[in-house]
Amino acid sequence: LGDVYKRQLVFHGQDPGEMLRLGIRFGKALQLINILRDIPSDLNIGRCYIPSVRLASLDMKVSDLKSEESMEKFRPLYNEYLDLACEYLDCAGDYISLIPRQHRRLRISCMLPVIIGWRTIRLMRRQNVLDQDKDVKIDRKQVVSILLKTRVASRFSNYESRLMRSERDLAQ
């Protein structure tokens, strides 16, 4: 994601190294959110992206993540990863701020997954993600609302800043 957009923006005077650094973190944010959201479904197909060493530090094994009762014990490590995803999303926000204002569609296409990511993190902080019966995702109505807000925000820098900041703050 970041690399594709970076190539477009190099022609607009942006530092390609900085765009690449931020773009990589942008991609990592979205990937980490998906990993953290999909733990039960990944376990069902024999995959786990949470390092065993990190689980062992909590006296846990991968198999413990198959039980929703393990969430309390897993929560500190899980929150640590959510915090890391927020840090990466902050870089995504910095990335968006480097996109020239006249490229509204590009700004919108970047803001949309960032805000969806923050809202997903907000849900993951409250829900037991190890519960296989509950999907952690925002509903279609919220996605439409976010799309409308980002379309307006792309026109007004003050509104864009407030929108991004408020979504970020609610995810913390």
Regions from the language model: what does each represent?
Residues 1-5:
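Short, small-residue-biased leader/transition segments that mark boundaries at the very start
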Residues 6-29, 36, 40-172:
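Catalytic cores of Mg2+-dependent Asp-rich isoprenoid enzymes
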